[in-house]
From Swiss-Prot:
The keyword Ion transport does not apply. This is Effector protein HopM1. Involved in the suppression of basal resistance and promotion of disease symptoms in plants. Mediates the ubiquitination and degradation, via the host proteasome, of a low-abundance immunity-associated protein in Arabidopsis thaliana. May be involved in the inhibition of a host vesicle trafficking pathway. The keyword 4Fe-4S does not apply. Residues 44-57 have a biased composition (Polar residues). Residues 22-58 are annotated as: Disordered. Signal peptide: none annotated. It comes from Pseudomonas syringae pv. tomato (strain ATCC BAA-871 / DC3000). GO terms for cellular component: extracellular region; host cell membrane; membrane.
Length: 712
């Protein structure tokens, strides 16, 4: 686990998490103490004889491994609470003992923990709790609880569960390193306990949300049953039945509100984070295992899965569509003036930009669906790679810690320090996640090298008379090969990318995505023009294409051999032509790649508290910030500020400023089009509303408002 959950200075004044010692005044206890009296009754299947036994009475019959007998005796001699403060003591022996019990008898973690020590480890259960009983009252008209009261009960219950889960995870962290002849066996025993704790934490962290959802579903069933009863009810009973139905509808509204509030609450976030801590060992193991399925020569599958659709896409939109449009306009619109050149650039860019987004949104989902349909995704490992979830592998820090074996609450300063540490670690991981994409300097350079290199090779082969490299198909194929090489390079980087956590574990940054694709959903995600975000993407691609074409058209033409001349061009002319071919490709792609990252950059800027001041111009604001604040943390960086005295970071900042300069004119135009788009749609909606024929109910309501009808 990440060490920041335990961290904090040793000499600070402590806030106690629990209070069970008779000699300590109650006011020194932690306000969210998890005492025995706060725990709900056990469910029937958990209230066996072990629940009523004391630790001393039950421990004699605990089925631990023979090698753990002395450990059990030492555990029995421990104090459950600190002698002075009354805070719970974190046992370094308990996790191994629970694992030993679980190996002998596979029961849920919460049952076995209580079996080890009922006084110390009676865990908080949703089943049978006051909270569950209170939620059940929502289905009883006339007994519906107060929303604020239930909300506080939910909050307190969630805090208690999170405290207990943190206690148990800290208990596992406190287990000493296994040594001696039983080291391997004890390590496996600890892993059993850790896995069981993770499973319990998963259930416990979801119990409140599932309980609320079940209560809402139960109310729906009651309402449906009442609707059936009302159909056959006598007239005299209908009034009371309608009242009961309305009470249930109101109760459902309250529960839906409580559920929505809880899902967004800090308590729910903390529960999810604590559960992630308890499951982290298994999550990392699963990620490593999954990555190993595409390790070595098996990595050819993901590379092909990325290269083939990118080859088809690049050959189509960068090759055939853009170049055929350019060739057609060259014959149609003579280059007589700058206006004619701008007109051609506008047409070529708009067509190519729209084609770029359309083809990418169609080809890749269809190719992935075809792989899954034929089974090649599994047989040949032809699966895409996806980034791991940052918050899952780097959860929020704990609020509690172990201080000399006592469970205590961290001070606000310690919490702030740990949060800053987690934030910095997440930034490192997020940098690795975007490093291979075309929205990162490294990823962009890969793409520029691949596309520029393929066009340079095509031009060279043409100039030395090996191929006719000026045909439409030759240029389109070169674009396709560039796309394939770019996608292959980026996938290869993803296959090798790892994040090393503070404990030295190597965690894969990308993992194979074997989830079943939904072709219709995937196509709509990029092609549903009813969505403002999709339309904005098309606007950005079209306007980026115009700017790209304008930049490319400013380049001088390649040197061609005079008609009827024999031999080949000079070496200098060939090198110049290769450079021009590569530069033309890079100049066109630079604006496209720069602008396609604006959406993510705007979101990151807003999350960092630096954006959102002008929502109508948020894309322009992002471009300006890239020029004015290229060193900000929300931008992807390859180098840290301290690397080589900051010199590489200065060069990278200049790179981001250049990107911002390319983004600014395009995104100003995009924001303008967005405003016009929104205005037109609002005007159309208003016109439709105005033309809509009034209904009889509308006429009656208007007459009632004007006093023409008497209310009944």
């Amino acid at each position: 686990m990440i060490s920041s959950r335990i961290g904090g200075a040793g000499g600070v004044e402590l806030s106690r998490v629990n209070q069970q010692h008779d000699t300590v005044p109650a006011q020194t206890a932690h306000p969210n103490a998890v005492t025995a009296g706060m725990n709900p009754p056990l469910t029937p299947d958990q209230s066996g004889s072990h629940a009523t036994e004391s630790s001393s009475a039950g421990a004699a019959r605990l089925n631990v491994a023979a090698r753990h007998t002395q450990l059990l005796q030492a555990f029995k001699a421990e104090h459950g609470t600190a002698p002075v403060s009354g805070a719970p003591m974190i046992s370094s022996r308990a996790a191994l003992l629970i694992g030993s019990l679980l190996q002998a008898e596979p029961l849920p973690f919460e049952v076995m923990a209580e079996k080890l020590s009922p006084e110390r480890y009676q865990l908080k259960q949703f089943q049978g709790s006051d909270l569950q009983q209170r939620l059940e009252k929502f289905a009883q008209p006339g007994q519906i609880p107060d929303k604020a009261e239930v909300g506080q009960l939910i909050k307190g219950f969630a805090q208690s569960v999170a405290d207990q889960l943190e206690h148990f995870q800290l208990m596992h962290d406190a287990s000493p390193a296994t040594v001696g002849q039983h080291a391997k066996a004890d390590k496996a025993t600890l892993a059993v306990s850790q896995t069981a704790l993770g499973e319990y934490a998963g259930r416990a962290s979801k119990a409140i949300g599932e309980g609320l959802s079940n209560s809402i579903a139960s109310l729906d069933e009651h309402i449906s049953a009442l609707d059936l009863t009302l159909q056959d009810a006598e007239q005299g009973n209908k009034e009371s039945l309608h009242a009961d139905r309305q009470a249930l509808v109101d109760a459902k509204t309250t529960l839906v509100g409580l559920h929505a509030d809880f899902v967004k609450s800090p308590e729910a976030k903390r529960l999810a984070s604590v559960a992630a801590h308890t499951q982290l060992d298994n999550v990392v193991s699963d990620l490593v295992t999954a990555r190993n399925t595409v390790g070595g020569w098996k990595g050819a599958g993901p590379i092909v899965a990325a290269a083939v659709p990118q080859f088809l896409s690049s050959m189509t939109h960068l090759g055939y569509v853009r170049l055929s449009t350019s060739d057609k306009l060259r014959d149609t619109i003579p280059e007589t003036s700058s206006d004619a050149n701008m007109l051609k650039a506008s047409i070529i860019g708009m067509v190519a930009g729209i084609a770029h987004e359309t083809v990418n949104s169609v080809v890749k989902p269809m190719f992935q669906a075809a792989l899954q349909k034929t089974g090649l995704n599994e047989r040949l490992n032809m699966v895409p790679m996806k980034a791991v979830d940052t918050n899952t592998v780097i959860p929020d820090p704990f609020e509690l810690k172990s201080e000399h074996g006592e469970l205590v609450k961290k001070t606000p300063e310690e919490v702030a320090q740990d949060k800053a540490f987690v934030k910095s670690e997440r930034a490192l991981l997020n940098q690795k996640k975007v490093q291979g994409s075309s929205t990162h300097p490294v990823g962009e350079l890969m793409a520029y090298s691949a596309f520029g290199g393929s066009q340079a090779v095509r031009q060279m082969l043409n100039d030395v008379h090996q191929i006719n490299g000026q045909t439409l198909s030759a240029r389109a194929l070169a674009s396709g090969f560039g796309g394939a090489v770019s996608a292959s390079s980026q996938t290869l980087l993803q296959l090798k990318s790892n994040y090393v956590d503070p404990q030295g574990r190597k965690i894969p940054v990308f993992t194979p995505d074997r989830a079943e694709s939904d072709l219709k959903k995937d196509l709509l995600k990029g092609m549903d023009l009813r969505e403002p975000s999709v339309r904005t993407t098309f606007y950005s691609k079209a306007l980026s294409g115009i700017q790209s074409s304008a930049l490319t058209s400013a380049l001088p033409p390649v040197t061609a051999q005079a008609e009827g001349a024999s031999g080949t061009l000079s070496a200098g002319a060939i090198l110049r032509n290769m450079a021009l071919a590569a530069t033309g490709s890079v100049s066109y792609l630079s604006t496209l790649y720069t602008n396609q990252s604006v959406t993510a950059e705007a979101k990151a800027l807003k999350a960092a508290g630096m954006g959102g001041a002008t929502p109508m111009l948020d894309r322009t604001e992002t471009a300006l910030n890239n020029i004015r604040h290229p060193n900000r943390e929300s931008l992807p960086h390859t180098f840290q500020k301290s690397t080589l005295s900051g010199i590489p970071r200065v060069a990278e900042n200049a790179y981001h400023m250049g990107r911002g300069a390319l983004q600014l004119p395009t995104q100003m135009a995009v924001d303008t089009v967005r405003v016009v788009d929104e205005g037109v749609l609002n005007a159309v909606a208003s016109a439709r509303e105005a033309l809509k024929q009034p209904t009889k109910d509308d006429d009656a309501l208007r007459a009632l408002e004007e006093g023409l009808l008497d209310p009944r």
